[in-house]
Regions:
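Rhodanese-like catalytic fold shared by cysteine-dependent sulfurtransferases
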Residues: 1-20, 24-63, 67-113
Length: 113
């Protein structure tokens, strides 16, 4: 699996590149805060969610979870590769690395409801 660094991911977001960004954590963590443009990818629904949002198996997909010790984005990448997706990258540093760098996060407004 190919990885992507924080700086590479930030540059892609800043440029508005066309790619799908998924946080591979349960919804409650996603709603607390997530990276800009990210969509939630529950670890128990990888195939269903991605195939609906990204039907093109060659589209670029970036996955992340909490930090470099969190295995869920790696598991999701393996599952997506088995489904025929060919352009998957993992942001290994994850949400923690992004926060530690002081980069912007998005809070789901439903978190307070």
């Amino acid at each position: 699996m190919v990885t992507i660094t924080r700086d590479e991911l930030k540059a892609k977001l800043d440029r508005g590149d066309d790619f799908a960004l998924f946080e591979v954590l349960p919804l409650m963590y996603f709603r607390k805060h997530h990276l800009p443009t990210a969509k939630n990818l529950p670890p128990t629904a990888v195939a269903e969610v991605v195939s609906e949002i990204v039907p093109d198996r060659s589209a670029e997909i970036v996955l992340y979870c909490w930090d470099d010790d969190c295995p869920t984005s790696g598991w999701a990448a393996t599952e997506l590769e088995a489904m025929g997706y060919t352009n998957i990258r993992e942001y290994v540093g994850g949400k923690k690395d992004w926060i530690d760098a002081g980069l912007p996060m998005v809070k789901d407004p439903r978190q307070d409801s």
